[in-house]
Amino acid sequence: MKKILLVLAFFITIVTSAYPQLGNNNMTLLANIDNHTVPYSALWGYKDANDGREYAIIGTFDGTSFVDITDPGNIHEVGFVPSTSPGNSNNLWREMKTYSHYAYIVSEVGNSGIQIVDLQYLPDSVHYVKKFLAAGHSSTHSISQEGPYLYLNGSNGGFGSGVVVMDLADPENPVKRGSYNNYYVHDCRVKNDTIYAANIYDSRVSIIKATNKNSLSLITSFINLPNSGPHNTAVTSDSKYILVTDEIGNTPRQLKIWNREDLGNITFVTGWQPTGITTTIIHNVETYGNYALIAHYEAGIRLVDITNKSNPVEVAWYDTYPSTNSLDYEGCWGVYMFPSGKIIGSDRNTGLYVLKTTFNVKMAIEGFYNSVLNTMISGDTVKAYLRNSSSPYNIADSSAAVIDAISLTAKFNFFNAAAGNYYLIVSHRNSLETWSGNPVVYNPMGFNTYDFTDSQSKAYGNNMKSIDTSPVRYGVFSGDVNKDQSIDLSDLGMIDNDASNFSIGYIPSDVNGDNVADLSDITITENNAFNFITIIRP
């Protein structure tokens, strides 16, 4: 049954507890596409170097699907390449990577080889080049890539069950170079001509020198204790740490972080698993700067801040398999993040998920805030803008979200701004537009936060009002009813007119959020007008 769920980009993520079966946190679902025969398997991403369009590539039971995810409101399949053995019961999964404008797909089914797909004709279509079989090659469990080289992992025994290097100097006709077969390799990652191989059945991780592609050599290996069953690896951007996922073995099957700065003494740093969950299986991890993006089977997609390697902090998640958390191999298989910050994940049963982490802004509206309850009387919609940090401060991106009355947090989605420093501006329907005290660092490939409430200096020119002393909180000024960037007699006139007419409902003149225009709204606005409150911006 074909099922495509598209969610508008301004959809607000539901905030719940740390247990993923109870909800999702700090991730917005943009689309869930499930229109192929299950089970689904691995996925990868491809960004067109010419036009910047983004594509998800996801393995299905009967082939590989190519999905354009560029426009959050129009996510759709643009191509499909059938399996070399469709319907074969041994062909339940496939893995893929990209190089230049080509995708390379492998599977464990016999005689599957490497499927080569030309992506240069996107967004119109994909072009299937051929199935490539090197001498002695039949099947491969997983595939990795760095530069113009593929690394085939866990291929058929006669070809190389460890790691085999394929040269892509001619992308449509790979050439076998060297191999390393001391142990079976389930998966690997390659960084700076160094292979980090997961030897799942030998409970170890091997670090292999691949500077000479014709002659791979072991640098060192270590036992991935405790409860070892290393499925895949990832390496931090500074190459100082190795992240390892334990798919098999005793529980907990968790993420492990190892310090590899001294290759003669690789040391265990810490283990991590989702808060409150010990019964799900970790599968794949990818690293992006100071973040680890994890496919955690029935616990779904998890984003973990690994800035402090000794204390990883989970900052966002989306549970693709909310019905249970068990030791079954269901749920999320693979994950990938684009430079835009879009996250894709594959669920074995429900297909492709496209997500985006939110930019969480904590703020309070003066008129709506109750200092006795330390909450706002109600939530309300706020617009947020990212403006360039230098004159003329052009708008780079914008979003809208609802402030939660209890947490005072609004969760925004930005899709256009690149990584950089921006002024953050918040604008409410009858409050004064407020700029951040300084440009804020925005990283689309991470989780971003800003708190206006904890210091007056968080607003440019200290342009906020003290609204609570315990806890100390500051709020944006209320009363700019006509949105002319100052609070003055013209705003008072509008409120007075509505109050005289006993106006009620969701109206601009309702400054305190009680759905009535009356004396209390006039009082708030009059105080700010008396103090000549106006916008302060660079």
Enumerate the predicted regions with their spans.
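Short, acidic Ser/Thr/Gly-rich low-complexity loop/linker segments typical of extracellular
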Residues: 390-408
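Short Pro-Gly-centered beta-turn/loop motif in secreted/extracellular proteins
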Residues: 407-422, 430
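Feature marking well-ordered beta-strand scaffolds used for ligand recognition
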Residues: 19-358
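Short coil-to-beta strand junction motifs in C2/discoidin
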Residues: 59, 374-382, 419
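Short amphipathic, basic-aromatic surface patches that mediate peripheral association
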Residues: 359-377
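Bacterial Sec-dependent N-terminal signal peptides
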Residues: 1-23, 359-362
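Structured interaction patches on ligand/partner-binding surfaces of diverse proteins
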Residues: 402-403, 431-467
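Alpha-helical segments with a strong preference for the paired helices of cellulosomal dockerin domains
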Residues: 351, 459-470, 481-508, 512-538
